[in-house]
Amino acid sequence: MRHKHGYRKLSRTSSHRKALLKNLAIAIIEREKIETTVPKAKELKRYIERLVTVARNADFNTHRQVFAALQSKEATKKLINEIAPKYEGRNGGYTSIVKTRIRKGDATPMAFISFI
């Protein structure tokens, strides 16, 4: 049984899931709005909100911690220098998920996830 399980598996191995979330996080940081499936968007929301909370500190160790999660210099710089300062006075709730459509090929519910 999966009672009180802490995260969505997304039908992937742990390494595949980590790579997926990292790539989706880089995409939303670069574009600030992406379309993905609803379960992926919900899991990405948890992942990216933790990163933004860490990035608000903006010291040297924060750069290292964010880079360790993203492995992208450009995304790390943009998150720490542009995105995180917007949310200085806000405690969480940096992203929003808007359900959009049902994908034609496999009837999967899709959603936009974007920074507020």
Swiss-Prot record:
Superkingdom:
Bacteria
GO-annotated cellular components: cytosolic large ribosomal subunit
**Family annotation (InterPro entries):** Ribosomal_bL17, Ribosomal_bL17_CS, Ribosomal_bL17_sf
Q: Which GO terms describe its molecular function?
A: structural constituent of ribosome
Q: Does the keyword Ribonucleoprotein apply?
A: yes
Task: Tell me where the signal peptide lies.
Answer: none
Per the UniProt entry, what is one GO biological process? translation
Entry keyword set: Ribonucleoprotein, Ribosomal protein
Question: Does Ribonucleoprotein appear among the keywords?
Answer: yes
Which sequence ranges form a coiled-coil region, renumbered to this chain?
Answer: none
- Could you give the subunit structure recorded for this chain? Part of the 50S ribosomal subunit. Contacts protein L32.
PANTHER family on file: LARGE RIBOSOMAL SUBUNIT PROTEIN BL17M, RIBOSOMAL PROTEIN L17
The molecule here is called Large ribosomal subunit protein bL17
Gene name on record?
rplQ
